[in-house]
Amino acid sequence: IGFLHSLGTNDKKIKSVFIVGGGLITFYLARLLVDSGISVTIIEKNPERCNMLCEKIPEALVICGDGTDKDLLDAEGLAYTGAMIALTDMDEENLIISMYAAYRGVQRVITKINRLEYASVIRQAGIDRVISPKYIAANEIVRYVRSMESLGGGDIKTLYRIIGQQAEMLEFVATPLTRHLGVPLSELPLKDN
């Protein structure tokens, strides 16, 4: 919801949004934007993904094409949209798309990156907002854990700050109510990586 509020600039409500990339974030974001009365245009390369987005979000205009193609972006009215959000899986593509949108005078330009070392370069290029799903998720987890600690609801023993304050490590105390108590780590149902 805070993300939607950030689309407003100087009391001018954004009425249209371009999203380049048709992944899961786009799916949920486009649904929120459409439900908020914002016109959404999605550009995605994968035809199957385009079909799915057309079926699930019929209110959005879904264009099957290359979001790095400036001729396509111009033909679809990029310069006249209120905001452009680059959500492809490639940081470099997102950077190029966002720089082009800023060059074309788009009011709000938001770029998704996975490698935070690009954040300063992107900001220097005149791009409004940089988002990192991994960083956002990590912050939400830390916020949740800290709230558990402050409410006395968790069994957090120690919070360590490591790697020059760039990472946090939590030490928990296992109680009889702890899920998977006594189960070796090798047998826990963990996701890869």
Can you name each region flagged by the protein language model?
Residues 1-193:
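Cytosolic regulatory regions of ion transport systems
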